Amino acid sequence: MAQQTPLYEQHTLCGARMVDFHGWMMPLHYGSQIDEHHAVRTDAGMFDVSHMTIVDLRGSRTREFLRYLLANDVAKLTKSGKALYSGMLNASGGVIDDLIVYYFTEDFFRLVVNSATREKDLSWITQHAEPFGIEITVRDDLSMIAVQGPNAQAKAATLFNDAQRQAVEGMKPFFGVQAGDLFIATTGYTGEAGYEIALPNEKAADFWRALVEAGVKPCGLGARDTLRLEAGMNLYGQEMDETISPLAANMGWTIAWEPADRDFIGREALEVQREHGTEKLVGLVMTEKGVLRNELPVRFTDAQGNQHEGIITSGTFSPTLGYSIALARVLEGIGETAIVQIRNREMSVKVTKPVFVRNGKAVA
């Protein structure tokens, strides 16, 4: 039986169509995925992300442990509340999960990991934390609401008390602060400004209702997917998994190669991959009628005249742009155009960087 978040009843009251998402009953949409998408791009929308797993790590060797566990380097985190995006890799350099790590004090860090990978993540973290003497607390007592869009922070702030408003004033992206009952972070999965707010389960429903009254539109998984794809953000299980290198998933920027003597899980394999080359993630744009879909083959001819085939990892119709976009994993050497076969038609697509929309504006 699928689990329910503490906001399940609120979703049904808001008219949600509920679906099973990796063992959780979650809203797909509340009537119109397109309207929800546009609300986030132009005003403010919110998502129940309580299915995500929050893991608190404590102990004097926590930083040392995370420098070994993660491909990115938490040595970069020197200011309390600062967050870092990283892959957590296996020994062969595949991605076990992508996550966000927050630094609070030398002996207190927080991870936010994906719901679909919860059990294997917790097992992996626990296994490798043992020699470092880390105390691991899974925060199942917390719900999480993501409020996203150009007006999201202002609308959310109407629910904050004076101390909370002061705590977030001037807070830069990728920071988090505990202010009273709320953990407020300037993170998100849409390419827009906003907050991800963790709060006690018993307070989540009232907070959700207050956000609705403040003019924040409830949004489901459908809009969350089109928004993240427009922003060029990876979805675990599509752009990357345990068999895919971060170098082939546009995550090379999250690998901290320096200092060269830092040993992290997967480093040796990544260094070989870096030397020999890997596939890469690109963007595809198709302005003709039709929709680029997951797992369609992408064919192209390189400069030497050799033919190659890649694959679409995520594809959709972009509500913001009004045409189809996709992320695709291909070999190096792809040019400015490629061919995608949709049913029995060969469609020409433009090859771009793997990002399409930033702050509501087209970049592709």
UniProtKB/Swiss-Prot annotation:
Keywords: Aminotransferase, Transferase
Cellular component terms (Gene Ontology): cytosol; glycine cleavage complex
Catalytic activity: N(6)-[(R)-S(8)-aminomethyldihydrolipoyl]-L-lysyl-[protein] + (6S)-5,6,7,8-tetrahydrofolate = N(6)-[(R)-dihydrolipoyl]-L-lysyl-[protein] + (6R)-5,10-methylene-5,6,7,8-tetrahydrofolate + NH4(+)
Gene3D superfamilies hit by this protein: Aminomethyltransferase beta-barrel domains, Aminomethyltransferase fragment, Probable tRNA modification gtpase trme, domain 1
Molecular function per GO: aminomethyltransferase activity; transaminase activity
Gene Ontology terms describing biological process: glycine decarboxylation via glycine cleavage system
Broad class of enzyme this protein falls into: transferase
Domain of life, per lineage: Bacteria
Enzyme Commission numbers on file: 2.1.2.10
HAMAP family (UniProt xref): GcvT
Complex formation: The glycine cleavage system is composed of four proteins: P, T, L and H.
Stated role: The glycine cleavage system catalyzes the degradation of glycine.
Family label: Belongs to the GcvT family.
Name of this protein: Aminomethyltransferase
Organism of origin: Shigella sonnei (strain Ss046)
